[in-house]
Amino acid sequence: MMLEELLRAHREEFRRKVVSALAKKHRASEEDVRSRFADAIERFIQEKYEVVEKVVARLNALSQERPVLLNIRRDPCSEEVCMICERDRPNVEALKRIYGESITFYEIFDSSPEVALYHIIHQEEGEKLLPMNAIIHKGEVVKFWTGRPVAVEEYQKYLDNILQ
């Protein structure tokens, strides 16, 4: 799963939903909506995806040099505590000690607009739980996990294979 392709697919699906909603609201065909509101739709989508496009570009650049461990978790300043995120934290810290500079650690909190990346990577149906941890290498989402702590050994299975 290439991160750029996931972003493109998500953006196109979102565009389809916007056109469909506008067609329903204006009692018009989707083709009519696409031609009448083309500029407004494009501006809306561009604004909606601006932040996440920058994050994807940054992760793509970083992951060309070395693997990236992306960690999307609850903001530690939030009043609500994510117990799963807290149980996962020592595993991520252990990876920092084990791998040091050989991998890049990239953290996003759920209070940031960058958190939209979660939905770009995890496009399947079902409940979306924090944390999300993903290994990204050369622009590809090699593996991602959601809603549970990930054992150090699970990460190592993928990271060691990449770093060989």
Predicted regions and their residues:
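N-terminal leader/targeting and pre-domain segments
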Residues: 1-68, 160-164
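Thiol-based oxidoreductase modules, predominantly thioredoxin-like and allied folds used
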Residues: 70-81, 86-117
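Hydrophobic beta-strand anchors of alpha/beta hydrolase catalytic cores
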Residues: 69-70, 133
